[in-house]
């Protein structure tokens, strides 16, 4: 099965001024595409050749895992952003956030602190635990909640290529911009 780069759910310039068109051209058009290309090359002639992306992520290791997980993580990340996003979630997700952190502002502060402090090339996730509660989880490199019992709700990509064009080494400014793009409808659908 040939894997393809999923289409973005918005135009390349739609996240500006928070994330520039140039960043998306590189991050989506080059980095994400390279993971797809590498994955297709690596799975030829293997047990994963006809597997879905999720099956590959859950069952593979080494280079195949790294590339398949990065394809999945990036696709999830793009869907977790939207033009004119931000604000706060409503409904059941908002209630679950309040139950865990006391308020959306307290959650936002905890997520931001976790993301800024997440060392190196990494991801910070809001996840739903098996018991239905929420948590903030940091992963390194290509690691993903898809391989655990946690259900990913939304993520912030903290690999340097996600923000270096726009923010250089100012990760905190990038994380601040993330809050203006967060797609709470996507997160709520994942929570349901």
Ranges and model annotations:
Residues 1-192:
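Feature for soluble, non-membrane regions of globular proteins
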């Amino acid at each position: 099965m040939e894997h393809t780069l999923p289409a973005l759910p918005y135009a390349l310039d739609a996240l500006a001024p928070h994330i520039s068109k140039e960043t998306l051209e590189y991050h989506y058009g080059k980095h994400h595409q390279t993971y797809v290309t590498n994955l297709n090359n690596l799975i030829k002639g293997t047990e994963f050749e006809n597997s879905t992306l999720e099956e590959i992520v859950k069952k593979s290791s080494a280079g195949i895992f790294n590339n398949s997980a990065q394809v999945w993580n990036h696709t999830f990340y793009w869907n977790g952003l939207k033009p004119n996003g931000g604000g706060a979630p409503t409904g059941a997700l908002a209630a679950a956030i309040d139950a865990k952190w006391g308020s959306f502002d307290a959650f936002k502060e905890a997520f931001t602190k976790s993301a800024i402090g997440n060392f190196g090339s990494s991801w910070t996730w809001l996840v739903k635990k098996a018991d239905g509660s929420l948590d903030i989880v940091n992963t390194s490199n290509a690691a993903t909640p898809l391989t655990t019992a946690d259900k990913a709700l939304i993520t912030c990509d903290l690999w340097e290529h996600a923000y270096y064009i726009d923010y250089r080494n100012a990760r905190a400014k990038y994380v601040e911009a993330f809050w203006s793009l967060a797609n709470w409808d996507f997160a709520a659908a994942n929570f349901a």
